Amino acid sequence: MKTKILLVFAILSVIPILCAMQSMTGQPVKKTRSSTFIYEKEKLWEPAGDGVTRQIMGYDGQAMLVKVKFEKGAIGTPHTHYHTQVTYVVSGKFEFTVGNEKQIVAAGDGIYIEPDAMHGCVCLEAGVLIDSFAPMRADFLVKPKP
């Protein structure tokens, strides 16, 4: 009986360690990280939709920071993901929808988006957003095949 209790305790104590070593996609996260310093002038803007481009500005398995540039009229298509997202409006004006709530946000404003919440935006004045994600968006690191 004592051996079984010790075995169960040992297994239960290892589970958090194993969980911390993998993202939701099962990929290891401990060794996944960006460079320490990321310079805007050296990063390409990646397409992220019509009139939308992005630069990944830093990440590890636990967090990611992404700069997103919108042309006027561009749409951040409504979507969900399991990540917590916090967005800071650097410039421009956007109509954001999070769940059933719709608000106009502008430079200096922020948006908190809980995991699995439907959200999207329409760019009313060209601008830039800074998106932070926890855990990182591993899907942003997958490059489409030509």
Q: Which residues make up each language-model segment?
A:
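Positively charged n-region of N-terminal signal peptides that target proteins for export
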Residues: 1-4
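Bacterial N-terminal signal peptides
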Residues: 8-17
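A short, N-terminal "cap"/entry segment at the start of jelly-roll beta-barrel domains
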Residues: 18, 22-62, 144-146
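Conserved short histidine dyad/triad with adjacent acidic residue
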Residues: 64-80
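Glycine- and acidic-residue-biased ligand/ion/polar-headgroup-sensing regions
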Residues: 82-94, 99
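A cytosolic small-molecule/anion-sensing beta-strand core signal
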Residues: 90-91, 106-107, 125
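Short acidic-glycine-tyrosine-enriched beta hairpin
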Residues: 101-115
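Ligand-binding loop in jelly-roll beta-barrel domains
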Residues: 115-139
